[in-house]
Swiss-Prot record:
Natural source organism: Danio rerio
Tissues and organs where the protein is expressed, per its UniProt entry: At gastrulation, expression is absent within the axial mesoderm. After gastrulation is complete, expressed in the presomitic mesoderm, but expression in the tailbud doesn't begin until the six to seven somite stage, after which it becomes abundant. Expression is abundant throughout somitogenesis within the posterior half of the somites, but is absent from older somites. Also expressed in a dynamic manner within the neural plate.
Name of one Pfam family that matches: WD40
Job description of the protein: Transcriptional corepressor that binds to a number of transcription factors. Inhibits the transcriptional activation mediated by CTNNB1 and TCF family members in Wnt signaling. The effects of full-length TLE family members may be modulated by association with dominant-negative AES.
Name of protein: Transducin-like enhancer protein 3-B
Renumbered ranges of WD repeats: 483-521, 529-568, 573-612, 615-654, 656-695, 697-736, 738-771
Region (CcN domain): 210-278
Low complexity bias: start-end ranges: 137-148, 207-217, 294-309
Biased composition annotated in UniProt, kind: Polar residues: 320-332
Keyword Repeat: yes
Region feature Q domain, mapped onto this chain: 1-141
Motif Nuclear localization signal: chain residues: 235-238
Modified residues annotated as Phosphoserine in this record: 296, 299
């Protein structure tokens, strides 16, 4: 135990000999401890240095990712501009004299011969003083690939005009370099990847009894964290993550009660069948999915037309008024793993792809139509639906926490306005591919399929007028946010368009959207109990009466014509909850979807229950009525959609599915019924023919659905935060918006000029539809 070279003290009588030995040993132990402490300090300094270097590398990674994305967009822009200018020259040249034609042709040919020396000189002139040489070299290399690439045919732009949003040729290069310089200067908060994925994994496990809304809003706030909040201290990060998790578990104000518990699914059952899940951007969904552990629940936030469920193992959440809902059906994933790292579980890079490919195949960067991009790129970018305006959106790069300052500046460099991620799809307004081509290299496979009576699926060849023509919107613009203060499970718009009604926990708020600056409701209608969610609210055609239903056995009828809104009557049923409401066109009858599966029919004049349609074996979740008032359509948690003859009071048809039905809408012009599934699909059925369309742009359950009053298009919203607008019936994607949380409800104004959505972010959003 002691060193051999120690000199023991001589033994003296009357004095114990071990005293000196113990003291010396203590000194040696102290010395060794101090040595180890110094060594530990040295290692800690080295560790901090490595952590700093790692963070710096991650910053560089995000910077180059931004650069590659910007370069790719710029390359496609310049290719398209050059092609159109070339076409204009070709049209003008015949008007010149023969001599001038030859001179112009030679000048055009000379202009096409761009050498590397000229490219380097151009980049050197345009480069900013603080732009690192490596970035200039990268740009030169990238541009040289574009300059010497093979010629590729592009679909012509209608009318040959330059689409809005493409900057002039002279300013494009400087805008691109500004982005590169910005990337080199910006301080990007990039979290430790391992901790980030661990946190997301714990998020999914902790979502058994919580709605997706808290996690969605927290992710959005994480994406907006400034660089000053990023800490290199692992201890501090662990404390922050612990705090974050406590926020998930303790946020009682979010939609804890809006969960459909499907945690009893069979782990051996495939999550998604291949025929229902086309690949995205060349990566098959089934490969990209992270396999959930057997005990990992799949929680589904519900909409105003979606059934409610209390988590059965949370006594404080249990309410006798709302039954727990169970599902034995296979359930798709609810949250895709965060792309961006090659070591993410379940994300395997394809052979030959450069690192970082997975980040570029993120759902937010998908191409909605099966149109080949101008040419396949090393990054498989192609055209992106979020390209126009959504560079400022925090959801563009999932898993990469890019500061909003940099995103906004990058958008400014490209001349885009600060608005949510809508896609006017100018490139889609061209003839599309034949049905035989299901996938194009560098583009997204088809998302709309025709399913024949025998079950054969074929991609849909869209007609030339799929996205153009009278009554077809080009995009939508967010014009107002209504801060309700609770999760908004129900929305409706008055006719004429002036007021918006938002239903949350225990109350409906009325907003006047005719005044743009209005930030507070004009009235509040307290309904049900304070802790019970409103699930549906419907206005009678005269706009003077509002009917409200939710997590209670009573429906409340409000008189809005009086000086202050008052309760005119209450309708009480035997079911503990109402999930959805419909009003007959003559305003005499109200239909309510009950949690026991029955459809209650109410006489509004006499305020009595006149009939019940019985058929659904589980909760009836959604409802719509035909324009002539003769037929009723209902969807349920028993995986069926049923139609009812209102004159004869009997069931007409039943459609069976493999997934719970969360939303549906019947086309005002007749023929078509759109159905939103728990499985993330939207299916468009014909009311008499057996064939149908299946649409695959949502990544999680489809929570609400509404047809435009013209019948030419409809919108759907989902737990994936998306608002999708589709062409009736074949489902060409008209535009898409990504919100910051699950979109639980939606409505369209009677003039088809406005859309309102209700969100898990405790707000409603008003969009103006642009034609």
């Amino acid at each position: 135990m002691y060193p051999q070279g120690r000199h023991p003290a001589p033994h003296q009588p009357g004095q114990p000999g071990f005293k000196f030995t113990v003291a010396e040993s203590c000194d040696r132990i102290k010395d060794e401890f101090q040595f180890l402490q110094a060594q530990y300090h040295s290692l800690k300094v080295e560790y901090d240095k490595l952590a700093n270097e790692k963070t710096e590398m991650q910053r560089h990674y995000v910077m180059y990712y931004e650069m590659s994305y910007g370069l790719n967009i710029e390359m496609h822009k310049q290719t398209e501009i050059a092609k159109r200018l070339n076409a204009i020259l070709a049209q003008i040249m015949p008007f010149l004299s023969q001599e001038h034609q030859q001179q112009v042709a030679q000048a055009v040919e000379r202009a096409k011969q761009v050498t590397m020396t000229e490219l380097n000189a151009i980049i050197g002139v345009r480069g900013l003083p603080n732009l690192p040489l490596t970035q200039q070299q990268l740009q030169a290399q990238h541009l040289s690939h574009a300059a010497h690439g093979p010629p590729v045919q592009l679909p012509p732009h209608p009318s040959g005009l330059q689409p809005p949003g493409i900057p002039p040729v002279t300013g494009s290069g400087s805008g691109l370099l500004a982005l590169g310089a910005l990337g080199s200067q910006a301080h990007l908060p990039v979290k430790d990847e391992k901790n980030h994925h661990d946190l997301e994994h714990r998020e999914r496990e902790s979502s058994t009894n919580n709605s997706v809304s808290p996690s969605d809003s927290l992710r959005a706030s994480e994406k907006h964290r400034g660089s000053s909040e990023y800490s290199l201290d692992p201890k501090k990060r662990r404390v922050e993550e612990k705090d974050n998790m406590s926020r998930y578990d303790s946020d009682g104000d979010k939609s804890d009660d809006l969960v459909v518990d499907v945690s009893n699914e069979d782990p051996a059952t495939p999550r998604v069948s291949p025929s229902h899940s086309p690949p995205e951007n060349g990566l098959d969904k089934a490969r990209a999915l992270k396999k959930d552990a057997p005990n990992s629940p799949a929680s589904v936030a519900s909409s105003g037309s979606t059934p409610s469920s209390k988590a059965k193992d949370h006594p404080h959440n249990d309410k006798s008024s709302t039954p727990g809902l169970k599902s034995n059906t296979p359930t798709p994933r609810n949250d895709a793993p965060t792309p961006g790292t090659s070591n993410t579980p379940g994300l395997r890079p394809h052979p030959g792809k450069p690192p970082g490919m997975e980040a570029l195949t993120a759902p937010a960067l998908r191409t909605p139509l099966s149109i080949a991009p101008p040419y396949g790129t090393p990054f498989m970018m192609g055209h992106h639906p979020e390209m126009n305006g959504s560079l400022t959106s925090p959801g563009v790069y999932p898993g990469l926490h890019i500061s909003p300052q940099m995103s906004a500046a990058a958008a400014a460099a490209y001349g885009r306005t600060h608005m949510p991620g809508f896609d006017p799809h100018p490139h889609m307004r061209a003839p599309v591919l034949p049905a035989s081509l299901t996938s194009i290299p560098g583009g997204k496979p088809a998302y709309s399929f025709h399913v024949s009576a025998d079950g054969q699926m074929q991609p849909v060849p869209f007609p030339p007028d799929a996205l153009i023509g009278p009554g077809i919107p080009r995009h939508a613009r967010q014009i107002n946010t209504l801060s309700h203060g609770e999760v908004v499970c129900a929305v409706t718009i008055s006719n004429p368009t002036r007021h918006v009604y938002t239903g949350g926990k225990g109350c409906v708020k009325i907003w006047d959207i005719s005044q743009p600056g209005s930030k507070s409701p004009v009235s509040q209608l307290d309904c049900l109990n304070r802790d019970n969610y409103i699930r549906s609210c419907k206005l009678l055609p005269d706009g003077r009466t509002l009917i409200v239903g939710g997590e209670a056995s009573t429906l409340t009828i409000w008189d809005l014509a009086s000086q202050t809104p008052r309760i005119k009557a209450e309708l009480t049923s035997s079911a503990p909850a109402c999930y959805a409401l419909a009003i007959s066109p003559d305003a005499k009858v109200c239909f309510s979807c009950c949690s026991d599966g029955n459809i209650a029919v109410w006489d509004l004049h006499n305020q009595t229950l006149v009939r019940q349609f019985q058929g659904h074996t589980d909760g009836a979740s959604c409802i719509d009525i035909s324009h002539d008032g003769t037929k009723l359509w209902t969807g349920g948690l028993d995986n069926t959609v049923r139609s009812w003859d209102l004159r004869e009071g009997r069931q007409l048809q039943q459609h069976d599915f493999t997934s719970q039905i969360f939303s549906l809408g019947y086309c005002p012009t007749g023929e078509w019924l759109a159905v939103g599934m728990e499985s993330s699909n939207v299916e468009v059925l014909h009311h008499t023919k057996p064939d149908k369309y299946q649409l695959h742009l949502h990544e999680s359950c489809v929570l609400s659905l509404k047809f435009a009053y013209c019948g030419k298009w409809f919108v759907s919203t989902g737990k994936d935060n998306l608002l999708n607008a589709w062409r009736t019936p074949y489902g060409a994607s008209i535009f898409q918006s990504k919100e910051s949380s699950s979109v639980l409800s939606c409505d369209i104004s009677a003039d088809d000029k406005y859309i309102v959505t209700g969100s898990g972010d405790k707000k409603a959003t008003v969009y103006e539809v642009i034609y």
